[in-house]
A protein has these predicted regions:
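NAD(P)H dinucleotide-binding glycine-rich loop of Rossmann-like/cofactor-binding domains
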Residues: 93-157
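Residue-level recognition of beta-strand termini and adjacent short loop/turns
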Residues: 12-14, 28
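Glycine-rich beta-strand-centered segment in the early N-terminal region that forms part
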Residues: 22-39, 49-100, 136
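Short glycine/threonine/proline-enriched tight-turn/helix- or strand-capping micro-motif at secondary-structure
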Residues: 15-22
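Short Gly/Pro-enriched turn/cap motifs at secondary-structure boundaries
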Residues: 11, 23-24, 56-62, 109-114, ...
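Short structural boundary motif marking the start of a folded domain
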Residues: 2-8
Length: 157
């Protein structure tokens, strides 16, 4: 298995590249790694591309995705390898009072993705973050997959 993957890289305003980068890997027991099925360009991605907001030069981008679970950390209970999932742009623990009140996007244990436009993605706090989708990607048309992707909190452009 390759130790690298292809990923979209923001170079500077107006310039993106696709580069080989280290493959996403588990770092914590509550992580999963997914193989990307679809990702998209969000309206906020266009802000830094146009130079209207900050984004570190030579950094991975993207924060909406659907994919298939490739690997799970030892503490993950909600999904298993082979499961099809939607990955929202904020990740969260799903267990604390903030998350239970419905405010996952401000979870004190959470954060935001900026690496979904790649072949693989590490998802921290997986049990509180991903949403399992019935079946597998092959069960859906391209139009249905595009619709599922909007479930990841896409901001219209």
């Amino acid at each position: 298995m390759s130790e690298t993957m292809k990923a979209a890289i923001f170079v500077e305003p107006g310039k993106m590249t696709v580069e080989e980068v280290p493959k996403a890997a588990l770092q914590q027991d509550d992580d999963i790694v997914i193989r990307m099925v679809r990702t998209c360009v969000c309206g906020s991605d266009l802000w830094f591309f146009r130079g209207l907001s900050g984004q570190a030069a030579h950094s991975q981008v993207g924060h909406e995705a659907i994919g298939v679970v490739e690997e799970t950390g030892a503490a993950v209970e909600s999904v298993k390898p082979g499961d099809f999932v939607v990955v929202p742009f904020p990740y969260s623990c799903g267990k604390g009072p903030v998350c239970k009140a419905g405010f996952e996007s401000v979870c004190p244990h959470g954060g935001y993705f900026s690496a979904c436009q790649a072949e693989y993605l590490r998802v921290p706090e997986a049990d509180g973050t991903v949403v399992k989708v019935p079946g597998s990607p092959e069960d859906y048309s391209d139009e249905q997959l595009a619709s599922l992707l909007t479930g990841s909190d896409v901001m219209s452009t």
